[in-house]
């Protein structure tokens, strides 16, 4: 068990010293979990970077090579691709985020233009001229370290797509097409790009072929087009039998397989002996047939009538006269036989079709085919593909050759070829990516075999037949489309200019290629705005696999089978995590250990089992490869030597679960976690939850808002650290070293390992402070290290949002009681204690971004200024002299964030206006106030302001101040880097120089002196370099240090100057924009009724009431509970995991309190302990709590380490209970007992209002609760007046449009039912779309009057207009006022 402790605190890294998670898992993982965002990184890396050392060509280069060389139409010039290179990006990620631009690298492509001279007589070409040139071909977006892209300043993720693998698929219609219910088999050859080829049986059992789903043709037409004759076709698909005439019948060889299971209608006689072998009408069993063969039966005698109805294999022709006796494929009949008798032919070669094992399908198709040779077949194919065009032989040839045999137009891809080879047992190289005749024949042969009942159809939903296209491949395909568009333009340009005088640059217009890339990143369905709510949602988004998108499925068309969980998903795709709703099953998540192989298939790792012993050798297998193995589960019991303990092992084979004998096992799972995705693996006791609730649990963790103070779960699964690290939320040290400086905004590390010449010896980590995420949550990083700490590469040095001590921390551990409380937890409502609000337990910070732009309008430029017409000083209190809000200002709804004025058109002035203008100056009249104001419902603190100016526009004071601050920051970084470099360099210089004899010295020293420390201290640093020493070796080292130092200083200065230059340069703003101001407002959101909360087990609810602490139920020792949940939410939903979590959390807290008590007692007993003394009592308590496996780890710590560890256990002792390998019921009981608590996990509770004890014990414990991103503040909304829709004149809907509440059909019924006529009339008229009426109501209310009249709703007018547009003239007429009994007035003539 020592390994168990080790895996928790391996050689203690910076965060592991502060906390140990007690692990309940027993299964040792044989392989490390791959990096969680490897899928994205690997794929893009393969797209961008070639590796000549291993002969790997990047996807980008492949694409360029597939389009180049481009030749002009006359063949006089050729533009060829040599190589490409990506230069350094102009701006780094942070600059792109701030400026709103794309993070990309300029791409230079070296092209070679070759000009030929064509000799028209001999038709040969000779090279006239070769020109090479680098051409700029736009910017290629780069991926950040975290697997995302910055496009126009927003972070996006390219989701991987799952699609049908190229290759061949065999299927049948499940008897749905034909009324008889017989299966119609079909085969489909799917290329990566090019025409689809479908083969199918129809109801008459004829084999047809369709190209690109066009009209069907007999399959033999396709075979004719491949150059086969009728005879060749028949002889390829059928065996031949030779029949020889005997006196009383025909002799035929005895083939065992043809007779097994058949029932002859005649006596079958042995030709040699004349004995009856098989009697007529009796079924021949396989045993009987085999026995006959064994006894030496080799030739049978069958009656002549038995030959009738068989088919000839060849044409039989009279050589001399040319008369055809019988054609290949014709039926043998009595007349034919007579002719053959007359001709003296006594040997017949017939096709081996016995209608039992082999059916006449191809022969029937051949006979039904109207085409008889290649030319007819080709013209039939041409007519189907190009209806309405008359075929000529050449065009038909060219069309057919281009369909499947031209690499330009048809590409199976390496994957397609591999799949084809595997399915059909071929052995073509995977570089052959077009179809061959033998491929087509093999497909038809397999289809016919299926019809004959041999072989199995394929399962489309098997992961062996679906593959993943990741970023690199998706972009490659898109770029190819762009290049092909470019190719057309280049060809036209080549034919219209004089090629001998141009350079490659003049021919290439890279716009189409650049546009294709931009379109892909900007608007493709798979390029998505990153879900950045918390680190887990980021990781999950990057690991998502979607079946939707271009070339994929659509929601409406996807049936149940595609969405369902398939046995091959095991270890590859998570069966739990998928959205609820219309996308269920179409959007999936990769399992934890899964990875995508070079062909795009998802692989999962297994341990090899050799001779019944499990080895530590790990193999990654795709679904196709796995199908041949029997795989044991990860939890199978093993002996210490790796052999299985039990005789029968629970295993999987070909998608079935079975108990297999141990000798049969060939592989074993690596870990129980490999089944589920990252989000599901974070749910403790997942094995005790119902699948539907686990699904909700894993989806809701992604919506947890990062809280003000993160707190890792006391009951975790051990995956928390992995997610925090791989998501990039927590910062890991790039190289080992010593912490040199730390403050809230940056960490400076002096590197001690991987220090190479030409590489800085200093790592500066800038922490993100109060940055806005895509979902408006707050990204804030905090350092975890102190100056002087030694860190190793990979240690966590700073926490990010939702992480604590390098572990994912999405929520809080809170004390929960399961009991009803006065109906406040009815229907999943949640009752919470006021303490939670007061102590900011679930408070989160949200950052909203507001921006305003000053444009150049027709009437003059807009201006951002403090000088706004008709605005009092009170409204301007937060603005500086440039008219922009201060950082730190508290702002509320309607407050001005940036003052802006827009010129308005001149209108003739009244005398009063002229007078005002003369008195008060210009401004007031010709501009209007268009300032940026805070929208309703938002209030908070301004945390950041950014000002962007167009090139050549003077910067205002605010912009200059911001720029100065930024330059100061850069200068500090450069100074620090220099200082550390100086310290390190001069210290190694001192070690080198002291004790050496000098050969050259600066002024004031004597040559030949021995260098001493005092001498160096007295010298100025710059003079140290003037020293030279006698010893050659030392002198060489001295010069090397000098060169390295100069190089490093140069690099630091260059970096600084480059950054400053970028800052001082103007910004690239959209056309017409002169200036842009962005203001970021941080809003503190406390928990309040209406907010949604959830646990990790799908137990979600809305807060119904916040109760004063004194009214909450309390425990025996007076501790009030934090949350009261409804016990009825558990049984029907079957998510029992939450109860086990409650118990274990309760035990954790109990143990934590024991340790805290021991620590306090020790402190009381040793008030003046300096920190060097070992707190023995505390250490013993820790050993007692953690158990034997952790003793070694605890004893290896010093006194300070023990105290730090103990003081971190206040909240509770952290547990890790991995999914499917976690704490059992007994473990939970043991922990409760160890903590000195009741084993039932229940406690006596007292009512906070009366002090009375509740009748029975209540389950109380600690649960990890999350606050979800569904906050009532974002949803609550009210409208008094606001915008109306143009046509219907009804208020708009929704909070974003400041709309009203819809009063729909059903609500109208409700008012009708109550007879509330006046309310109903108001709702349908003056409160909605009676334009005149609502204006009158407004006027009346303003005057204090409350009588009003309803008019005609606008929607009625719309209806009338619509009817008129149909030619029905509808007019309204009123009853005559004098005589109410009279009918309506007659309509005018037009209506008749």
Curated annotation (Swiss-Prot):
The keyword Nucleotidyltransferase applies. GO terms for biological process: DNA-templated transcription. One of its GO terms (cellular component) is DNA-directed RNA polymerase complex. The RNAP catalytic core consists of 2 alpha, 1 beta, 1 beta' and 1 omega subunit. When a sigma factor is associated with the core the holoenzyme is formed, which can initiate transcription. PANTHER family: DNA-DIRECTED RNA POLYMERASE I SUBUNIT 2. Belongs to the RNA polymerase beta chain family. DNA-dependent RNA polymerase catalyzes the transcription of DNA into RNA using the four ribonucleoside triphosphates as substrates. This is DNA-directed RNA polymerase subunit beta. It comes from Sphingopyxis alaskensis (strain DSM 13593 / LMG 18877 / RB2256) (Sphingomonas alaskensis).
């Amino acid at each position: 068990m020592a390994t168990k402790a080790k895996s928790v605190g391996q050689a203690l890294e910076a965060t592991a010293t502060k906390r140990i998670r007690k692990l309940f898992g027993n299964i040792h993982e044989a392989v490390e979990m791959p990096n969680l965002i490897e899928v994205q990184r690997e794929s893009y890396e393969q797209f961008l970077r070639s590796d000549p050392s291993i002969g790997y060509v990047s996807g980008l280069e492949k694409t360029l090579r597939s389009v180049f060389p481009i030749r002009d139409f006359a063949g006089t010039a050729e533009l060829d691709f040599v190589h490409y290179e990506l230069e350094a990006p102009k701006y780094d990620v942070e600059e792109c985020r701030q400026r709103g631009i794309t993070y990309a690298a300029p791409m230079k492509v070296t092209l070679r233009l070759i000009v030929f001279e064509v000799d028209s007589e001999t038709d040969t070409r000779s090279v006239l001229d070769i020109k090479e040139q680098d051409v700029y071909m736009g910017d290629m977006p780069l991926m950040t370290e975290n697997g995302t892209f910055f496009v126009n300043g927003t972070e996006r993720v390219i989701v991987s797509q799952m699609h049908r693998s190229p290759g061949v698929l065999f299927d049948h219609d499940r008897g749905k097409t034909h009324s008889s219910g017989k299966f119609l088999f079909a085969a489909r050859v799917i290329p990566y790009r090019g025409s689809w080829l479908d083969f199918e049986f129809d109801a008459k059992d004829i084999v047809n072929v369709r190209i690109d789903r066009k009209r069907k043709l007999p399959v033999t037409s396709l075979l004719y087009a491949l150059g086969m004759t009728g005879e060749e076709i028949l002889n390829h698909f059928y065996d031949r039998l030779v029949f020889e005439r005997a006196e009383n019948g025909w002799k035929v060889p005895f083939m065992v397989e043809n007779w097994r299971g058949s029932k002859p209608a005649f006596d079958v006689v042995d030709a040699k002996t004349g004995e009856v072998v098989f009697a007529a009408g009796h079924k021949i069993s396989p045993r009987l047939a085999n026995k006959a063969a064994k006894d030496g039966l080799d030739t049978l005698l069958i009656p002549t009538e038995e030959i009738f109805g068989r088919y000839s294999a060849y044409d039989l022709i009279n050589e001399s006269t040319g008369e055809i006796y019988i054609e290949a494929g014709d039926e043998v009949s009595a007349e034919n036989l007579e002719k053959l008798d007359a001709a003296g032919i006594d040997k017949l070669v017939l096709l081996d079709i016995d209608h039992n094992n082999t059916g006449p399908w191809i022969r029937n198709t051949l006979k039904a085919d109207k085409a008889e040779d290649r030319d007819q077949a080709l013209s039939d194919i041409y007519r189907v593909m190009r209806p309405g065009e008359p075929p000529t032989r050449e065009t038909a040839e060219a069309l057919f050759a281009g369909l499947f045999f031209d690499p330009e137009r048809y590409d199976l891809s390496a994957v397609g070829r591999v799949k084809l080879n595997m399915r059909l047992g071929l052995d073509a190289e995977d570089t052959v990516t077009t179809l061959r005749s033998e491929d087509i024949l093999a497909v038809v042969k397999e289809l016919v075999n299926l019809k004959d009942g041999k072989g199995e159809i394929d399962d489309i939903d098997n992961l062996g037949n679906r593959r993943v296209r990741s970023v690199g491949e998706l972009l490659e395909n898109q770029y190819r489309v762009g290049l092909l568009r470019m190719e057309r333009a280049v060809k036209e340009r080549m034919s219209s200019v004089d090629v001998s005088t141009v350079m490659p640059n003049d021919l290439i217009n890279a716009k189409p290629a650049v546009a294709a890339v931009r379109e892909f990143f900007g608007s493709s369905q798979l390029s998505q705005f990153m879900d950045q709510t918390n680190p887990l949602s980021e990781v999950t988004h990057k690991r998502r696999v979607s079946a939707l998108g271009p070339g994929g499925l659509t929601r409406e068309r996807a049936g149940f089978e595609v969405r369902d969980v398939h046995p091959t998903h095991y270890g590859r795709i998570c069966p739990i995590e998928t959205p609820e709703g219309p996308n269920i099953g179409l959007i999936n998540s990769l399992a934890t250990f899964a990875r995508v192989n070079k062909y795009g298939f998802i692989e999962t790792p297994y341990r090899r089992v050799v001779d019944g012993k499990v080895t530590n050798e790990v193999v990654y297998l795709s679904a196709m490869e796995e199908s041949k193995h029997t795989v044991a589960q990860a939890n199978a019991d093993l002996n210490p030597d790796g052999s299985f303990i039990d005789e029968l092992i629970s295993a999987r084979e070909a998608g079935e679960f079975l108990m297999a004998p141990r000798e049969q096992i060939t592989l074993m799972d690596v870990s129980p976690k490999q089944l589920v995705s990252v989000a599901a693996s974070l749910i403790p006791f997942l094995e005790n939850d119902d699948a539907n609730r686990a699904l909700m649990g894993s989806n809701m963790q992604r919506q947890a808002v990062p809280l003000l103070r993160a707190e890792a779960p006391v009951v975790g699964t051990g995956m928390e650290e992995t997610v925090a690290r791989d998501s990039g939320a927590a910062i890991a040290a790039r190289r080992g070293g010593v912490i040199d400086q730390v403050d809230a905004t940056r960490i400076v590390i002096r590197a001690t390992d991987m220090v190479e010449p030409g590489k800085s010896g200093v790592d500066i980590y800038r922490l993100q402070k109060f940055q806005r995420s895509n979902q408006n949550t707050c990204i804030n990083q905090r350092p975890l290290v102190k100056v002087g700490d030694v860190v190793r590469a990979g240690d966590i040095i700073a926490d990010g949002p939702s992480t604590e001590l390098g572990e994912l921390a999405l929520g809080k551990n809170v004390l929960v009681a399961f009991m009803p409380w006065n109906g406040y937890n009815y229907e999943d409502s949640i009752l919470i204690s006021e303490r939670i609000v007061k102590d900011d337990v679930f408070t989160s910070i949200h950052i909203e971004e507001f921006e305003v732009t000053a444009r150049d309008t027709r009437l003059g430029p807009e201006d951002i200024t403090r000088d706004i017409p008709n605005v009092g000083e009170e409204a301007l209190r937060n603005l500086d002299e440039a008219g922009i809000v201060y950082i730190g200002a508290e702002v509320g709804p309607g407050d001005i964030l940036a003052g802006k004025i827009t010129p308005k058109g001149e209108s003739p002035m009244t005398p009063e206006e002229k007078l005002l203008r003369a008195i008060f100056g210009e401004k007031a009249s010709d501009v209007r106030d268009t300032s940026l104001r805070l929208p309703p419902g938002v209030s908070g603190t301004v945390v950041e302001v950014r000002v962007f100016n167009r090139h050549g526009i003077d910067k205002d004071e605010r912009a200059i101040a911001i720029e100065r601050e930024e330059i100061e920051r850069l200068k500090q970084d450069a100074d620090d880097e220099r200082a550390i470099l100086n310290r390190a360099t001069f210290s190694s210089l001192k070690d080198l120089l002291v004790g050496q004899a000098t050969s050259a010295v600066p002024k004031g020293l004597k040559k030949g002196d021995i260098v001493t420390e005092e001498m160096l201290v007295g010298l100025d640093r710059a003079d140290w370099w003037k020293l030279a020493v006698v010893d050659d070796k030392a002198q060489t080292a001295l010069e090397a240090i000098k060169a390295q130092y100069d190089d490093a200083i140069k690099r630091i200065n260059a970096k600084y100057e480059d950054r400053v230059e970028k800052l001082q340069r103007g910004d690239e703003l959209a056309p017409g924009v002169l200036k842009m101001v962005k203001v970021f407002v941080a809003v503190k959101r406390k928990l309040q009724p209406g907010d949604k909360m959830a646990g990790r087990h799908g137990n979600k609810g809305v807060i119904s009431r916040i109760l004063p602490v004194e009214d909450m139920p309390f425990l025996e020792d007076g501790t009030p509970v934090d949350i009261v949940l409804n016990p009825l939410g558990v049984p029907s939903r079957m998510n029992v995991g939450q109860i086990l979590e409650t118990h274990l959390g309760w035990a954790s807290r109990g143990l934590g309190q024991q340790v805290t008590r021991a620590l306090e007692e020790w402190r009381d007993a040793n008030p003046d302990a300096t920190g060097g003394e070992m707190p023995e009592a505390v250490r013993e308590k820790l050993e007692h709590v953690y158990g034997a496996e952790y003793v070694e780890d605890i004893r290896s710590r010093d006194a300070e380490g023990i105290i730090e560890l103990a003081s971190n256990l206040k909240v509770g002792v952290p547990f890790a209970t991995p999914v499917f390998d976690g704490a059992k019921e007994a473990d939970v009981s043991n922990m409760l007992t160890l903590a000195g608590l009741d084993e039932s996990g229940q406690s006596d509770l007292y009512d906070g209002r009366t002090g009375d004890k509740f009748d029975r014990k209540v389950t109380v414990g600690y649960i990890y609760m999350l606050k979800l991103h569904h906050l009532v503040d974002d949803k609550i909304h009210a409208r008094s007046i606001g915008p109306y829709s143009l046509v219907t004149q009804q208020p708009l809907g929704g909070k974003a449009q400041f709309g009203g509440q819809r009063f729909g059909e059903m609500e109208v019924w409700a008012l009708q039912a109550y007879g509330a006529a006046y309310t109903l009339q108001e709702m349908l008229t003056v409160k909605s779309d009676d334009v005149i009426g609502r204006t009158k109501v407004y006027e009346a209310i303003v005057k204090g009057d409350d009588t009003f009249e309803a008019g005609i709703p606008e929607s009625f007018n719309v209806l009338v207009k619509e009817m008129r547009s149909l030619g029905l003239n509808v007019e309204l007429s009123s009853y005559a006022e004098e005589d109410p009994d009279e009918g309506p007035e007659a309509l005018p003539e037009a209506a008749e």
